[in-house]
A protein has these predicted regions:
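Folded extracytoplasmic luminal domains of secretory or organellar precursors
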Residues: 25-309
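Cleavable N-terminal signal peptides of Sec/SRP-targeted secreted and luminal proteins
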Residues: 4-24
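Helix-loop boundary elements of multi-pass alpha-helical membrane proteins
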Residues: 1-3, 97
Length: 309
C-alpha cells in the first residue's frame, strides 16, 4: 500500500507522538486513498467507510480482548498498552481502509484479524494460566531475551553501531532493514532509535498497522488486501494455495516461518486468537471466513535462513 501526503495525518501524528524526540511525521504515498462508493461514508470524510473504529470498537471491548495485559505478576509491559493509544494510531490508517472497508461485519472481522496477530505475538499466557493464552495478549512490548542483535548487511538501512534490532512493538519488528523501512514510512528515525517502539504505545500500534496495510514488495497484496477481498489471486497464486482469507494474512506477515509447514502450533495459535476475538466482539467464529489457514500455502516471499526471526 502506497500513501500520499496527508496534512491531517501529519498534524495528528505530530501531536500524538510528541513524546518521541524526532521530526514531524506524515505518511506518504503515490496511491490515492480509497473513496467510499456505497453510500455509507462517515460524516466529514468521503474516504472513511461506514462507522469509525472508535464507534465500532469501544474501550470495554478492548478490555475484554486484553484483560490480563496489566497483571501484576506475569505481564511484562504493565501500564504500557491502552485503548487510547490504539484508537489514536488507528485514526491515521482509517482513511486508507483499515477497518473501514465494507459493511460493519467486515469492519469487525478485520479488527479481530489484525488484533489476533497482535495478541498471538504478544501473549505471555499458556493453557495453564487463567483465561488461557487468549487473555494475555499485549503482555509484552519487546523481546525479553534476544538471541541475537538482528543486524544484517543492507545498503539502504545499515546497522547503527551499538543498536540492537530485536523484536519490539504490537506486531514485533525485527532486523535493521525493517526498522528502517517502517521508520521511513512513519517519518520516525527507528533505524537509530528502535527503542521508540517500546516507549510509545501509539507509535508501536502505528508500526503494526503499517505492516498490516503495506505489501512486502511491489505488485504484491497487503494483509489488509487479502483479508477484505480486494486482492484477486493469479493462477500462480492459486497453484500455490494462496487464496483470500485469514490464512493469507499469516503468509504475508510471516511467510514460511509459519506457512507451508502443515498445521503447526504457531499457525493454529494465531487462528485461535482470531476466532476467540470474533466471539468476544459479537461476530462469532462461524463468520471466520474461508481459507483460515496457510498450512499448504507457499510463501509470497521465501525467507533467507540468516534473516529468520
Amino acid at each position: 500500500m502506497g500513501m500520499r501526503s496527508l496534512a491531517a495525518v501529519a498534524l495528528l501524528a505530530l501531536l500524538v507522538l510528541a513524546a518521541v524526540p524526532t521530526e514531524g511525521r506524515s505518511l506518504t504515498s503515490k496511491e490515492k486513498e480509497k473513496i467510499c462508493d456505497a453510500g455509507w461514508e462517515c460524516s466529514g470524510s468521503k474516504y472513511c467507510c461506514n462507522e469509525t473504529i472508535s464507534k465500532l470498537f469501544q474501550v470495554y471491548q478492548f478490555e475484554q480482548l486484553f484483560p490480563k495485559r496489566n497483571d501484576d505478576l506475569l505481564a511484562h509491559a504493565q501500564q504500557f498498552w491502552d485503548y487510547h493509544s490504539f484508537i489514536t494510531a488507528s485514526s491515521v490508517f482509517q482513511p486508507l481502509g483499515f477497518a473501514t472497508t465494507g459493511a460493519k461485519q467486515m469492519q469487525m472481522m478485520e479488527l479481530a484479524a489484525f488484533l489476533a496477530h497482535v495478541g498471538a505475538k504478544t501473549t505471555c499466557g499458556d493453557m495453564e494460566v487463567d483465561g488461557g493464552p487468549w487473555a494475555w495478549g499485549l503482555c509484552y512490548n519487546h523481546e525479553m531475551s534476544p538471541s541475537q542483535s538482528y543486524c544484517a548487511d543492507d545498503f539502504k538501512y545499515p546497522c547503527v553501531d551499538g543498536v540492537q534490532y530485536y523484536g519490539r512493538g504490537a506486531i514485533p519488528v525485527y532486523w535493521n532493514y525493517n526498522y528502517g523501512r517502517i521508520g521511513d514510512a512513519l517519518k520516525v528515525d527507528l533505524l537509530h532509535h528502535p527503542e521508540y517502539l517500546e516507549r510509545n504505545a501509539t507509535l508501536a500500534f502505528m508500526a503494526a498497522m503499517w505492516q498490516w496495510m503495506t505489501p512486502v514488495k511491489k505488485k504484491q497484496p497487503s494483509a489488509h488486501d487479502v483479508f477484505v477481498g480486494s486482492w484477486k489471486p493469479t493462477k500462480n497464486d492459486t497453484e500455490a494455495y494462496r487464496l483470500p482469507g485469514f490464512g493469507a494474512t499469516m503468509n504475508i506477515m510471516y511467510g514460511d516461518l509459519i506457512c507451508g509447514k502443515g498445521y503447526i502450533e504457531s499457525m493454529n495459535n494465531t487462528i485461535s486468537f482470531y476466532q476467540h476475538y470474533l466471539d468476544l466482539m459479537g461476530v462469532g467464529r462461524e463468520h471466520s471466513g474461508d481459507n483460515l489457514d496457510c498450512a499448504k500455502q507457499k510463501a509470497f516471499n521465501p525467507s533467507a535462513p540468516e534473516y529468520d526471526a
